[in-house]
Amino acid sequence: MRVIQTAGKRKTAVARATIREGKGRVRINHKPVEIIEPEIARFTIMEPLILAGEEIVSRVDIDVKVEGGGFMGQAEAARVAIARALVEWTNDMNLKEKFMKYDRTMLVGDSRRTEPHKPNRSTKGPRAKRQKSYR
């Protein structure tokens, strides 16, 4: 039995996806993807599944474990992990091209991270300054 593991990151969230032969079940942290709330996060996670098509998704089971970050960061990390898993499972360049054309970050990831706080007014953020008055 073939098993493939992939990972996806977004901000501080890390998702690890395991894909194997099955009946089309997709689970995020042991929950079926259909009951993930909020709805926007569910749709984000399902993007690669919809793009790949029913004939590919119905033949595999995907388990994703996500930790860290907020709900949207977790959803986008899961989306990256699922997309990478599907491309690796099918070895299909057309699918990879379809994902890249739709949204490049689905396979490549988003390298943006939060800027570290600077020492001036550390609790306020990286660029916060005291307000300056001229009169």
Curated annotation (Swiss-Prot):
This is Small ribosomal subunit protein uS9. GO terms for molecular function: RNA binding; structural constituent of ribosome. One of its GO terms (biological process) is translation. The keyword RNA-binding does not apply. Residues 108-135 are annotated as: Disordered. Belongs to the universal ribosomal protein uS9 family. The keyword Translocase does not apply. One of its GO terms (cellular component) is cytosolic small ribosomal subunit. Residues 108-118 have a biased composition (Basic and acidic residues). Coiled coil: none annotated. Residues 119-135 have a biased composition (Basic residues). It comes from the Archaea. Keywords: Ribonucleoprotein, Ribosomal protein. Part of the 30S ribosomal subunit.
